From Swiss-Prot:
Pathway: Amino-acid degradation; L-histidine degradation into L-glutamate; N-formimidoyl-L-glutamate from L-histidine: step 2/3. One of its GO terms (cellular component) is cytoplasm. GO terms for molecular function: urocanate hydratase activity. Binds 1 NAD(+) per subunit. InterPro entries: Urocanase, Urocanase-like, Urocanase_C, Urocanase_central_sf, Urocanase_CS, Urocanase_N, Urocanase_Rossmann-like, Urocanase_sf. Its main location: cytoplasm. It comes from Shewanella baltica (strain OS195). Disulfide bonds: none annotated. Transmembrane segments: none annotated. This is Urocanate hydratase. It catalyses: 4-imidazolone-5-propanoate = trans-urocanate + H2O. The active site is at C410. One of its GO terms (biological process) is L-histidine catabolic process to glutamate and formamide. It comes from the Bacteria.
Length: 555
């Protein structure tokens, strides 16, 4: 019997102000863990899988139950330690220490590969935490929508003079992360054709308003795109098909999209990518009997897809890797020029990282959408001179369906995160918000990740693989008083290719929270400015000087 599978489970986080735990500092991680497994949030909640192939919230259901039990009895001077989804210890610390410290999927570098991890996973000794799955701050597909939107806006500026009308994006994957592409693309003015082999995922994106239409043939999908472009109104289409098949077929037909990318779960060839010609049932059966065959076939199909992406790039498409390590997989299968198209961070996002700008997110623990709408208004009030941000918040309210507890994401940087958070804390204190909020972020941020094929690709000084930075980030956030801090390996791009840290803090309206919030949400983005200044980026150096950061080697 698989202790990770229980179809009888239906997890819904409590709403309102009644506590199940001894304070909001422990109620918050409990609700957010539960929210990660909400049926409208998680990809496979019955298996504890939140997103990203096998990214889990807890190692198994026994561990989940025990985590909840411990959080409900945890005192405000105690800290729970979670090792790869398993609660392993409670220790006396102090009131400003994190209530939970999490380490997920971390392996000694020589053994940091999928083969060794999968053996540990089978033995029940490890859990793949992805980024926000095992760190309990996943907010559904919204969590990556704005970052994807910002990327597509940058693509339009760089390649099409800012004009996206009448243009379309080809991509693959409509899972928890990939599902953002369709909505983000149409928000940015593009039509989007997204290939997905799992029809339930397309239907899920239709239900949550991330996809406009479903197609079952390439001809049908292309007709939908053409009709929308002729009408000047962008549309998103979920095509039930294998991305490798579709990408190669478009090359064969001589049909060139304007933009090409991919967000299949290529980072995990065993569990995340369906080989060409295979059904999902066949793949599921083969994973139990011949893992090596599945991996080989999946990587061979990735090679086909990447070759097609290169061919489409040659034909004129703006082509980018969206951080799932598909280029690496294809390179290992003999596609020697797999890295000829860039990753999205060095191509479009790094200037934002240099100012500590990244995916700031918050969640209303009350469960009341009005709390989010009030914080939206507060963001506009405190940042009045950013029409791009205001436009994002307006579009988000109009077009993004909340999944689980109401949440919002917006990309802001060093100069704004702490003051926004302090304002939210004050809103809780004076009763404007009906309950506390938690503030966190993706591990994809400016100072919290080392990932040479994604966030730290092509660093100016060649420090792509130096992973001291996320370790320092986690240590500093712990010292600063975050409510929970996490340190993971392998998120986004798979085992052996990344290390990254997460942080969440509770705004409960107290003066003590204000002090913690002020420290954490200044120091956290400041480490990103520090990291990029150290690598030699002038934008980061200037930001550090303007914000008064004490960086000894930058004097």
């Amino acid at each position: 019997m698989d202790k990770r599978h229980d179809p009888s489970r239906r997890i819904i986080a409590p709403h309102g102000t009644q506590l199940s735990c001894k304070s909001w500092l422990t109620e918050a991680p409990m609700r957010m863990l539960m929210n990660n497994l909400h049926p409208d949030v998680a990809e496979r909640p019955e298996d504890l899988v939140v997103y990203g192939g096998i990214g889990r919230a807890a190692r198994d259901w026994d561990c989940y139950d025990k985590i909840i039990e411990v959080l409900q009895r945890l005192e405000d001077d105690e800290t729970l330690l979670v090792q790869s989804g398993k609660p392993v210890g409670v220790f006396r610390t102090h009131a400003d220490a994190p209530r939970v410290l999490i380490a997920n999927s971390n392996l000694v570098p020589h053994w940091a590969n999928w083969e060794h991890f999968n053996e540990l996973d089978k033995l029940g000794l490890a859990m793949y935490g992805q980024m926000t799955a095992g760190s309990w701050i996943y907010i559904g597909t919204q969590g990556i929508v704005q970052g994807t939107y910002e990327t597509f806006v940058s693509v339009a500026k760089q390649h099409f003079d800012g004009i996206s009308k009448g243009k379309w994006i080809l991509t693959g994957g409509l899972g928890g992360m990939g599902g953002a592409q369709t909505l983000a693309g149409t928000m940015a003015g593009f039509s989007v054709l997204a290939c997905e082999v799992d029809e339930t995922r397309i239907d899920f994106r239709l239900r949550t308003r991330y996809v406009d239409k479903k197609a079952t043939s390439l001809d049908e999908a292309l007709a939908m795109i053409e009709e929308a472009n002729q009408a000047g109104k962008p549309v998103s289409v979920g095509l039930l098909a294998n991305a490798a098949d579709v990408f190669a077929e478009l090359v064969k037909r001589g049909v060139t999209p304007d933009v090409v990318t991919d967000q299949t779960s290529a980072h995990d060839p065993l569990n995340g990518y369906l080989p060409q010609g295979w059904t999902m049932a066949e793949a599921a059966a083969m994973r139990k009997t011949d893992e090596a065959a599945v991996i080989k076939a999946a990587k061979a199909s990735m090679a086909v897809q990447v070759q097609a992406m290169l061919d489409l790039q040659t034909a004129g498409a703006a082509t980018l890797d969206y951080g799932n390590n598909i280029r690496q997989m294809a390179f290992e299968m003999g596609v020697e020029n797999a890295f000829d198209f860039p990753g999205f961070v060095p191509a479009y996002i790094r200037p934002l990282f240099c100012e500590g700008i990244g995916p700031f997110r918050w969640v209303a623990l009350s469960g009341d959408p009005e709390d989010i709408y009030k914080t939206d208004a507060k963001v506009k009030e405190l940042i009045p001179d950013n029409p791009h941000l205001h436009n994002w918040l307006d579009m988000a309210r109009e077009r993004i369906a909340f999944q689980g507890l109401p949440a919002r994401i917006c990309w802001v940087g060093l100069k704004d995160r702490a003051r926004l958070a302090l304002a939210f804390n004050e809103m809780v204190k004076n009763g404007e918000l009906s309950a506390p909020v938690v503030i966190g972020r993706d591990h994809l941020d400016s100072g919290s990740v080392a990932s040479p094929n994604r966030e730290t690709e092509s660093m100016l000084d060649g420090s792509d693989a130096v992973s001291d930075w996320p370790l320092l980030n986690a240590l500093l956030n712990t010292a600063s008083g975050a409510t929970w801090v996490s340190l993971h390996h392998g998120g986004g791009v798979g085992m052996g290719f990344s290390q990254h840290s997460g942080v969440v803090i509770v705004c409960d309206g107290t003066d003590a929270a204000a002090k913690r919030v002020g420290r954490v949400l200044w120091n956290d983005p400041a480490t990103g400015v520090m990291r990029h200044a150290d690598a030699g980026y002038e934008i980061a150096k200037n930001c550090a000087k303007e914000q008064g950061l004490d960086l000894p080697m930058q004097d």
